[in-house]
């Protein structure tokens, strides 16, 4: 099946979905209605672009016909030639858009994410920068209409973040934030620096798709679950009832502790969400490392310690090293307006995948 047959088939299916979604029998079946609604939403942009493409093809045909029937009228012929020229340029643009829209979708793109940020090299300054990154992602989430929930956090003495785990929920969260995993470097003058010297610090970010229990089954025998009393500042026990939960995945020694909630069950549920995502991510990374060709077709090397971006405060500059993008908009980006960076990463990734398909 060539690309045009594929697009026509997709348009036929889209029209069929429209009829199904207005069928009372389907509407009464909540599960099926939701599945079909999702399929319809996922094909909507491709079908709309294909219909615009067909309009362009018709414009080319009309312009060519007008030239033939101009009867030598130079004004009509010139107008038709100009329209033909513009339509041919638009045709090429739409063909590229359609190729990108037909690229195989990442099955995780529609998922919520678990976001982890840690202060790394640089002590207090790294922890403060980790807090800046948390604020940036939280503001970006708000601008997208997503829900941002801090699930677990530990702070240092100067208000910085040692480690934070957050759940980001909404439409296509993973598709936009999946490129954020890696080491983020900051260059700035710390508030404690009396000589005005620029210091370099690092925070690491990990983005994992939320994994439902039906998608990834962890054998209960592989888990050790400990229950203990939650502790507050200074280490004192804050609950008379043991509500804090520690879960260890024994085969990988991945550990999650949760004490943010007031009940043991809520802490356990949140801890399971995190450990399921971490264990799935652990084995996904192993599989990815074994597939060199696949890794080359994605942004970066896949190494979680890879430096992906530098934030230079004195120059108000952000540089994404994977795609060579430099923007003099650090203040804007840290305020949560990340669209320009994310759009560039998405476009680069799509271009790389297209080149791989065309080889």
Curated annotation (Swiss-Prot):
Keyword Cytoplasm annotated: yes
Modified positions (N5-methylglutamine) in chain numbering: 236
Matches recorded under SMART domains: PCRF
InterPro entries: PCRF, Pep_chain_release_fac_I, Pep_chain_release_fac_I_sf, Prokaryotic/Mito_RF, RF-1
GO molecular function, one term: translation release factor activity, codon specific
Xref: PROSITE patterns: RF_PROK_I
Ranges of compositional bias, category Basic and acidic residues: 293-308
Pfam families named in the record: PCRF, RF-1
SUPFAM superfamilies: Release factor
Post-translational modification: Methylated by PrmC. Methylation increases the termination efficiency of RF1.
UniProt cross-references to NCBIfam families, sorted A to Z: prfA (TIGR00019), PRK00591.1 (NF001859)
Family listed: Belongs to the prokaryotic/mitochondrial release factor family.
HAMAP family the record matches: Rel_fac_1 (MF_00093)
Listed name of the protein: Peptide chain release factor 1
Organism: Streptococcus uberis (strain ATCC BAA-854 / 0140J)
């Amino acid at each position: 099946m060539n690309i045009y047959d594929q697009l026509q088939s997709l348009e036929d299916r889209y029209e069929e979905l429209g009829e199904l979604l207005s069928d009372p029998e389907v509407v009464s079946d909540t599960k099926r209605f939701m599945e079909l609604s999702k399929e319809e939403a996922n094909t909507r942009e491709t079908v709309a672009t294909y219909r615009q493409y067909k309009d362009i093809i018709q414009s080319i045909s009309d312009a060519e016909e007008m030239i033939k029937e101009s009867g030598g009228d130079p004004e009509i012929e010139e107008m038709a030639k100009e329209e033909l020229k513009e339509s041919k340029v638009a045709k090429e643009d739409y063909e590229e858009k359609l190729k990108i829209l037909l690229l195989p979708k990442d099955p995780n793109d529609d998922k919520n994410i678990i976001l982890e940020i840690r202060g790394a090299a640089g002590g207090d300054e790294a922890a403060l920068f980790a807090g800046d990154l948390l604020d940036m992602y939280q503001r970006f989430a708000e601008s997208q209409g997503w829900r941002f929930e801090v699930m677990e956090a530990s702070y240092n003495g100067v208000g910085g973040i040692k480690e934070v785990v957050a759940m980001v929920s909404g439409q296509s969260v993973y598709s936009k934030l999946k490129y954020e995993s890696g080491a983020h470097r900051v260059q700035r003058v710390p508030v404690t620096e009396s000589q005005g010297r620029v210091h370099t610090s690092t925070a690491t970010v990990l983005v994992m798709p939320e994994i439902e229990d039906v998608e990834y089954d962890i054998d209960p025998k592989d888990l050790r679950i400990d229950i203990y009393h939650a502790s507050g500042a200074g280490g004192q026990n804050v609950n008379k009832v043991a509500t804090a939960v520690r879960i260890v995945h024994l085969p990988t020694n991945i550990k999650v502790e949760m004490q943010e909630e007031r009940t043991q069950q809520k802490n356990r549920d949140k801890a399971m969400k995190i450990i399921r995502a971490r264990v799935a991510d652990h084995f996904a990374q192993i599989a990815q490392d074994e597939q060199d060709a696949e890794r080359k077709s994605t942004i970066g090397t896949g190494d979680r310690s890879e430096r992906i971006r530098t934030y230079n405060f004195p120059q108000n500059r952000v540089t994404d090293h994977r795609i060579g993008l430099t923007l003099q908009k650090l203040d804007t980006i840290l305020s949560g307006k990340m669209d320009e960076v994310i759009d560039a990463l998405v476009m680069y990734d799509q271009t790389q995948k297209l080149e791989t398909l065309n080889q």
